[in-house]
Amino acid sequence: MKRLIWIGMLFALCLQGMAQTNKTTNGQTLVVRKTTVTKKTVPANTTKQGSTKQTQAKQTTTKQSTANASGKTDKTTFNQKTAADTQAQKESAALQQSTGYLYNAPLPYLPQKLDVLFIGNSFSIDTSAALPSILSSLGMNNVNVYVLYKGGCSMKQHYEFYKSGEKVYELYRYNSQGEVQLEKTTSIGEVMQRFPYDVVVWQQYSLESGDYTSYEPYLSKLIQAYNITKLSARTTFAFNETWAYASNAKNLTRYKNQKNMWKSICTAVRKMKAASGIDLVIPCGTAVQNAREVEALKVDNELTRDGTHISNYAGRYLLACTFFESIIAPCMNRSIREDNTTYGKSTDVGQVNDTNRRLLQNCARLAVANNYEISEFAGQ
């Protein structure tokens, strides 16, 4: 009996163990099923990711479309701005050409030394004569103006003398120390190669200054010749505009009257500047015409000493102021307003002093601001 009882108990225990095993197995199966279910959820996530990628792709496409549209807009805006800038430049150039507003971009700025070659005639001497007084007054010891002088020399003659190499010129230097003759006889070709000039100024024979055909093609050819032999890396070319004769000058009959001569000069110079390599104009002719409109400056014979050449003091100072404001002032960042020189003796007619200095400076500065028009503000 006892054995049977023990056998029954053992059998019961076996059955209980099998049940537990099945329960565990079922649990594993459930876990596996759960895992399987979990694994089956992965495609769902993949679908979500695919949707996200599709959304991102759409967004990228939209951004690219927007960027392309923006790029086209930017390009259109850029082209419009470029066209507007180009038109503004053309209008500015046309304004400078029509009115003569000075454009000083070609000039050197604040050089250690400024060397200017002035190729001309007696009118060039008149323009330079008062420069030493101004330069000395301002303490400017680093400016030299070399004047290559041949009396009554025209542009055509300058060209012919260059080709022939004739030594028919005199060479002068003007600086803060005064005037000195460097050579009694020299040629234009030799002097062109003497120094690395920063600026070269040309002057026409006064009687022909209102005739454009007397300028070209001679001036352009001389500029070409200079460019071949020049020592400087960059040279600015300027032209000194001649003044009209006094109303009683004998040679004025060619132009009928003074005002017409001045207008003819302005027309010829403006046309010459457009056709040649001239960078800027020194408007001495307009400065003189401004001064002739000012009652307080009506001395000598309309600012001339013989009807054609400028008067020795007020006239020469006026020309020097115009030269200074056109060339030296923008290069060296100085103003003619700083000058307080007294030019001439108290007994000299037209002496420059505190009574007329500012008026003469005004006439010069107004001409530099507008090369081809008489200013209503000259007397202020």
Stretches found by the model and what they are:
Residues 4-13:
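Sec-dependent N-terminal signal peptides
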Residues 18-106:
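Sec-dependent signal peptide cleavage junction
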Residues 72-162:
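Serine-esterase "nucleophile elbow" of acetyl-processing enzymes
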Residues 108-118, 198-206, 344:
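Acidic/histidine-rich, surface-exposed loop or edge segments in extracytoplasmic proteins
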Residues 126-216:
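Conserved SGNH/GDSL esterase-like catalytic core that processes O-acyl groups on lipids
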Residues 185-313, 325:
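Alpha-helical cap/lid subdomain in secreted, periplasmic
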Residues 307-380:
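Conserved catalytic region of serine esterases and O-acyltransferases that act on ester linkages
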